[in-house]
């Protein structure tokens, strides 16, 4: 996937990421997962977004990069959230990767838990070291076009954003592959 792909707005990229592959290399081993659920955060006009009203902090600085960079942060003091920055530099939008479906064979894994944003980062060993990483040309964490992009997309309200304004709470900016068993539960 090239830079141009990520220069679109977050709601467009969030839909287009579905079915594509996220690849994590750990100790010469590749873990391949298929993105099955995303949420769009539309920047300074979206009260659910960390960069709402142009808020810029050490944590949100990653969102001000050009599209294609990662934005990783911690919630509840223990769960890492993996986002992909979209749009132009200084237009702080991002897509939260909410759930993924394992594709590569996993040696020694009996039960894979990737149906939630905190679970998938734990599974893929994504932590703050992956904040502000350019995902284009990176060797440890990168995206690749999926082979099967024939599916229905469900649009719904985003999850756990009760702090946002009502208009933003009601936006249908959560996207997932219909019928996929790895989609997170609300």
Swiss-Prot record:
Keyword tags: DNA damage, DNA repair, Hydrolase
Pfam name, any one: Pur_DNA_glyco
Keyword Transcription (UniProt): no
Keyword Iron annotated: no
An example molecular function term from Gene Ontology annotations: DNA binding
EC number(s) recorded for this UniProt protein: 3.2.2.-
Domain of life, per lineage: Bacteria
Group of enzyme by EC: hydrolase
Any one of the GO BP annotations: base-excision repair
Coiled coil (residue ranges): none
HAMAP family: 3MGH
Family from the record: Belongs to the DNA glycosylase MPG family.
Protein name (record): Putative 3-methyladenine DNA glycosylase
Species classification: Bacteria, Pseudomonadati, Spirochaetota, Spirochaetia, Spirochaetales
């Amino acid at each position: 996937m090239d830079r141009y792909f990520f220069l679109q707005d977050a709601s467009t990229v969030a839909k287009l990421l579905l079915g594509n592959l996220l690849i994590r290399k750990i100790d010469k081993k590749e873990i391949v997962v298929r993105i099955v659920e995303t949420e769009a955060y539309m920047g300074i006009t979206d009260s659910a977004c960390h960069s709402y009203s142009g808020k810029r902090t050490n944590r949100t600085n990653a969102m001000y990069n050009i599209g294609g960079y990662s934005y990783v942060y911690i919630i509840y003091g223990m769960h890492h959230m993996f986002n992909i920055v979209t749009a132009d530099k200084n237009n702080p939008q991002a897509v939260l990767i909410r759930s993924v479906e394992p594709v590569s064979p996993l040696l020694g894994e009996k039960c894979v838990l990737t149906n939630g944003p905190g679970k998938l980062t734990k599974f893929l060993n994504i932590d703050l070291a992956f904040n502000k990483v350019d995902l284009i040309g990176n060797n440890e964490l990168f995206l690749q076009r999926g082979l099967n992009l024939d599916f229905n997309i469900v649009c719904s309200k985003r999850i756990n954003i009760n702090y946002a304004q009502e208009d933003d709470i009601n936006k249908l900016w959560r996207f997932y592959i219909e019928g996929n068993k790895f989609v997170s539960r609300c």
